[in-house]
Design a protein with these regions (language model features):
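Fe-S-dependent hydro-lyases/dehydratases of central metabolism
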Residues: 1-308
Length: 308
């Protein structure tokens, strides 16, 4: 309706063919294109006022809460048998990439929210907006409020630290295991990593210190992303039928790892040992190289160094 309360129809605002032709002729003027293209790199006054450091490398701002230098190139390569690992999460079927790495608003009371507020940040924004800050994304790993980790009674980003059985956030547990020098695995059911092909779902898994994900089946793209981050996907039978409780110590033999090869997995609880034959979901020779190098970035870095 217009200001006088009369109804306005599409036909009233639809441009005539003459108006369309006039604007078309204006936009198709070659002189307009030429004048704009000649100054395309000059920018306006605000663009010209931006301070740009002269450097061949990006000048990382350590105070930034949006973009931080990620640790991908500095992390140590730890390929080899996985021994004495603990289960960080015990999950059911259809765990999505949003369960693994949420993209929505950051809860002020979440681990990531508390971290940002301690830095004096008032507008927390979303995980998606802060995906350039690995410190935020790491704290957001498996922090989806709807996640059900079967190691604990409550929903959300919680788990148990073993052997003490203390309940804490997934982030806190991962850091505690890191201090103790304990490698980690995740055990899940069918269709692990379904949903959108979110790269941070694989990145945060690696950042949490997870060496392998053991599941009944994997979503295609997430499986590939895990391999690219140096995390080994292993298919195993339904863990619920194996008698696994989640407090076991896990050993995985990888000495003779091959493409889609068999992998021996042991779940040890006291004197009890459950032996499982898994299958490495490393589907090509190049993926095998990625896993052995600790991920695709390290593979590329090492290749460039050797060629140089």
């Amino acid at each position: 309706y217009d200001p006088n309360g009369r109804p306005v129809y599409l036909k009233d605002i639809w441009p005539s063919m003459k108006e369309i032709a006039d604007f078309y002729n204006l936009a198709m003027n070659p002189e307009l294109y030429k004048s704009r293209s000649e100054k395309i790199f000059e920018g306006d006054e605000n663009w010209k006022k931006l301070k740009v450091p002269e450097s061949e490398l990006y000048d990382w701002d350590e105070k930034s809460t949006y973009i931080r230098m990620p640790p991908w190139s500095s992390a140590e390569n730890s390929f080899g048998d996985i021994r004495g690992a603990r289960i960080l999460l015990l999950l059911g079927d259809k765990i999505t990439t949003d369960h693994i790495s949420p993209a929505g608003p950051i809860d002020p009371n979440s681990v990531a929210g508390v971290y940002l507020r301690q830095l004096g940040v008032s507008e927390l924004n979303t995980y998606g907006a802060r995906r350039g800050n690995h410190e935020v994304m790491l704290r957001g790993g498996f922090a989806n409020p709807k996640l059900k980790n079967l190691l604990v009674d409550q929903v959300g980003g919680y788990t148990k630290h073993f052997p003490d059985g203390k309940v804490m956030s997934v982030y806190e547990a991962s850091q505690k295991y890191k201090e103790e020098g304990v490698p980690l695995v995740i055990v899940a059911g069918k269709q692990y990593g379904s949903g959108s092909s979110r790269d941070w779902a694989a990145k945060v898994t690696a950042l949490l210190g997870v060496r392998a994900v053991l599941a009944e089946s994997f979503e295609r793209i997430h499986r590939s992303n895990l391999v690219a981050m140096g995390v080994l996907p292993i298919e195993i039978p339904d863990w619920r039928g194996l008698g696994i409780k989640g407090d076991e110590i896990v050993n995985i033999q990888l000495e003779n790892l091959t493409v889609r090869g068999k992998v021996k997995v042991e779940f040890v609880r006291g004197e009890q040992k459950i032996e499982v034959e898994g299958r490495a979901r490393v589907d090509t020779n190049i993926e095998l190289d990625y896993i052995k190098e600790g991920g695709i970035l390290k593979y590329v870095f090492n290749k460039l160094l050797h060629e140089g």
